[in-house]
Regions:
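Mid-to-C-terminal catalytic subdomains of enzymes
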Residues: 172-223, 227, 313-314, 320
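AMP-forming adenylation/ATP pyrophosphatase catalytic core
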Residues: 4-34, 54, 89-91, 102, ...
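A broad structural signal for alpha-helix termini and local helix breaks/kinks
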Residues: 46, 114, 210, 272-276
């Protein structure tokens, strides 16, 4: 098979070098139209790139038809002479986030077992647009809107999303044009899930009343934000040693004053991520940023975990919570030493 989408992907891979010649590639194959489209494209391009290709299917055991879905994937892979592993979740994931975390653990471990250098997933431009909208409605930073990067590290493996230039409508048309069998996941039509409601109700409304090319423009926006994110991440890594003191933890506020607002916020965020387990948000970052020009001795309100930051000369220092005072000694026990610790 060879068509316009083969040519487009072939050209993109030559330019971007996401999947170099001779790479060992593990395909995340759910059996849906997007992953079937991706698998067929890679199999058709394989002679030109001399890849090793294998597939993995993750069975979350959420649906009554999950075993039938897994068997469908096995049969399709066998028909296409594609090595395929089906992995069942040992426990039912409680949330979509937990399921996603488990899937990516499977991708990484299976790739290592097969000596694969790359894992590919079939996320499309439509997925990217949906993710951007979801994050925007929930509230996030510009970096949070730079969703579904085309390529990123997954431990020692490289995760690649080759279909970000195709919409879901295009993958459906591809499967139909080439007569490819696909598995219909009925849960994709359940609007109890936020992403499904956005996909089935909000995006069609926005396309009809605001912009018929919504998925394309949102995908382009995510791509522009991703390039900005890559630049700022590199700048933060370059500047961090000049701004962040590790021991004891502190920020150099004189150095921060010299930097643009965007870098101030990102460096503060980087510092706080090292020391806060939870609760990092815009208000916390702005409270710390206010200390850049505050008077000596100024401090933030208590941060998550009971910590706070305080101005001490040129430094904004992290102050850990004081340990609780010792319990009062009961009457009649004053001066009595505690029993010695047991020896092991």
């Amino acid at each position: 098979m060879w068509g316009i989408h083969h040519a487009r992907l072939h050209t993109t891979l030559k330019i971007q070098q996401w999947l170099p010649l001779g790479s060992r590639i593990l395909i995340a194959l759910s059996g849906g139209q997007d992953s079937v489209c991706l698998t067929r494209l890679l199999l058709d391009l394989q002679p030109h790139w001399q890849w090793f290709l294998a597939a993995v299917h993750c069975d979350h055991r959420w649906r009554a038809d999950s075993t039938a879905n897994a068997n469908f994937v096995r049969q399709l892979a066998q028909k296409w002479h594609l090595p395929c592993e089906v992995v069942c979740a040992p426990d039912l994931p409680k949330t979509e986030a937990a399921a996603r975390s488990w899937r990516y653990q499977v991708f990484e471990s299976m790739a290592k077992a097969l000596d694969c250098t790359h894992v590919v997933t079939a996320h499309t431009q439509s997925d990217r647009a949906e993710s951007l909208l979801l994050h925007l409605l929930r509230g996030t930073s510009p970096d949070g809107l730079a969703t579904l990067l085309p390529s990123r590290s997954l431990g020692a493996i490289q995760l690649v999303r080759p279909l970000l230039g195709m919409t879901r409508a295009e993958t459906a048309a591809f499967c139909q044009a080439y007569g490819l069998p696909i598995w219909q996941d009925e849960t994709n039509h359940n609007v109890a899930y936020r992403r499904n409601r956005l996909r089935l109700e909000l995006i069609p409304y926005l396309q009809q009343h605001f912009n018929p090319n919504l998925e394309e423009v949102l995908g382009q926006t995510a791509e522009l934000l991703a390039s900005d994110r890559a630049y700022f991440e590199a700048e933060v890594e370059r500047l961090a040693p000049t701004v962040i003191r590790e021991h004891p933890p502190a920020l150099d506020r004189l150095r921060l004053r010299e930097l643009p607002l965007a870098l101030q916020r990102r460096l503060i965020q980087r510092f706080l991520r090292q020391h806060l387990k939870r609760g990092l948000n815009f208000r916390v970052i702005e409270a710390v940023r206010a200390l850049i020009t505050a008077g000596n001795g100024s401090q933030t309100a208590s941060l998550p975990g009971g910590k706070h930051l305080r101005v001490c000369g040129r430094w904004i220092e992290l102050v850990r919570p004081m340990p609780p005072p010792p319990a009062p000694v009961p009457p009649g026990q004053g001066g009595r030493s505690p029993p010695p610790s047991p020896l092991y």
